Amino acid sequence: MNKKIHSLALLVNLGIYGVAQAQEPTDTPVSHDDTIVVTAAEQNLQAPGVSTITADEIRKNPVARDVSEIIRTMPGVNLTGNSTSGQRGNNRQIDIRGMGPENTLILIDGKPVSSRNSVRQGWRGERDTRGDTSWVPPEMIERIEVLRGPAAARYGNGAAGGVVNIITKKGSGEWHGSWDAYFNAPEHKEEGATKRTNFSLTGPLGDEFSFRLYGNLDKTQADAWDINQGHQSARAGTYATTLPAGREGVINKDINGVVRWDFAPLQSLELEAGYSRQGNLYAGDTQNTNSDAYTRSKYGDETNRLYRQNYSLTWNGGWDNGVTTSNWVQYEHTRNSRIPEGLAGGTEGKFNEKAAQDFVDIDLDDVMLHSEVNLPIDFLVNQTLTLGTEWNQQRMKDLSSNTQALTGTNTGGAIDGVSATDRSPYSKAEIFSLFAENNMELTDSTIVTPGLRFDHHSIVGNNWSPALNISQGLGDDFTLKMGIARAYKAPSLYQTNPNYILYSKGQGCYASAGGCYLQGNDDLKAETSINKEIGLEFKRDGWLAGVTWFRNDYRNKIEAGYVAVGQNAVGTDLYQWDNVPKAVVEGLEGSLNVPVSETVMWTNNITYMLKSENKTTGDRLSIIPEYTLNSTLSWQAREDLSMQTTFTWYGKQQPKKYNYKGQPAVGPETKEISPYSIVGLSATWDVTKNVSLTGGVDNLFDKRLWRAGNAQTTGDLAGANYIAGAGAYTYNEPGRTWYMSINTHF
């Protein structure tokens, strides 16, 4: 970033202006002279691509491992990997509208979370990570907002698919506390069980001060090392005894505190500090499902640990004239400590038994400054102008991922201009952004919200993101909502780092018969997507029905390159991370909520994918169901007793069409997952005004899937050593599981 832009970023972010990016909406709008001020951020929450999960819904349908389990029941949302490879198949993360987990921005109280970026991206773009949706205990969540399409694009870098904003429960001026516990019992003993307990305490610290404190401890056991025995893809020779792994376990420890100072009417300062530790319990997974005696010996051990620290200072202000502002700075440090892994061919992602250290650290520092101001304007029409800015810096020190040797055995020889063994472990990038939106109420039934965002990235340069959202009432019951926006995602610190190099002896190379390298590329372009949607909504007397068409025209998606950019002295081809010119995602979302009676509510949503295509290769972008139907029937049987039934129906899942060399998938690589459904039952009893119990069963009819391997064949099926491809059978669907939770509060 040049000095002028850098200086401007620092000055503006000291609080002169404000950014509307990623801000948690205030609990109540500011009113002045009987005029309600509605900001663009709040108006976007009314877009067709927005859903909300409440604390009560989480209480009545408690999650086991991760809140992604309930987020996936929203329209347009599924769980998948970053590609069609099936690698790390059981570490599926949130995918919104088929754009992949890397294009889903995770926020906690409006502030981005970036810990998963400390995990290395493999050749196919996968990370060995559980994602960033488990840093807050489910019982500490007030609500979760899921934004899709144009409504999400306003949040800038990483939101091309959508945004998940996890909003925590707040403190108050009165003393309150809670203690919660959850445990489950899988019917199949080879599946890992979960136990969780947490507490919270809020209260006053004098007339102007208050606080909130929570702590959490949970443990999920790893699936048995042989859970997929008998379901693995065909394997021969040196791979004959290998097995694809089940779901890994995890131990979470969290502590978080906030002190709030209400120093004047409508003015507050909040200081937050948090610490989390997540350690996995190894289930036997390797990137290429080629386990050996050493990897099997690590079963049940912690093989990677994430230590996350976050600190933030927030100033929220309002004035009698309706002007509001929100300004905050956040520092997030993640230490990713893990067993060293191989970086070449079949050993990529496999524990390196000969490494000099038992564990190596990857340290990621993320500093973010945000500022926003909302200005009500009474000129021609009622409108609220939002102006803002943002500055973000990421710095990483990776002592492991830049160590692929370029000389000696299992290498492809030296690369001109690149050190063979002593490459820098450091990388960094900065983004400076300016932001403007105007929420205009043209008539009582017509709202227009134009917006414009500018981002300057220190490596890939400038990006402009215009947006336009329109809401038009059609009589008393119908509303037509439309939006179009240009979304944006900068490349990762791995993709732009020339010191990050992977090696393959040939099978992983797109157009090379022999060995090849894949190198980071500091000449990449940012990914962009033109996101469009049109939705029609009907509301009357508790009924709600809607249908939305969406299309994302995806440009410059970053993948491992398809064309060698050079060759070294010994004939090894050099590939780089590269931009795919065009891809497209298109689909339909529908919803239907029916008040069956005063005590019974039936809610439904469906997502149908029309297109998911890389226009360069013709391949799919990810493995997701053709359609997903979520249905919940809720019955308030008594004032203190509620029951619900959940039903999810997944359409067929098709695997990748082509292998890594661009050749059509054949044989077992073409296996599809047929449609299947999952049914759940639960009941919640409010024992007293301070105690409630929830019990239930997930997957009532015990529909299970087993991970058979990665999507593509490793080796030659006609040869002596191979692992056959698994097609779409790259993850485990757990069977019938009983659970219970207790929630207490005072």
Q: What positions do the PLM features span?
A:
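Extracytoplasmic beta-strand/coil segments of soluble accessory domains associated
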Residues: 68-116
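Surface-exposed extracellular loop regions of Gram-negative outer-membrane beta-barrel proteins
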Residues: 279-281, 458-460, 476-532, 549-575, ...
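Gram-negative outer-membrane beta-barrel transporters
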Residues: 180, 441-445, 549-554, 565, ...
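A beta-strand signature from Gram-negative outer-membrane beta-barrel systems
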Residues: 128-180, 745
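Outer membrane beta-barrel strand-and-loop segments of large Gram-negative receptors
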Residues: 366-375, 423-427, 433, 521-525, ...
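N-terminal periplasmic "start-of-domain" segments of outer-membrane beta-barrel proteins
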Residues: 32-64, 68, 93, 118-126
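C-terminal beta-signal and adjacent terminal beta-strands/loops
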Residues: 114-117, 555, 649-658, 684-746
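Transmembrane beta-barrel wall of Gram-negative outer-membrane proteins
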Residues: 190-280, 307-309, 379
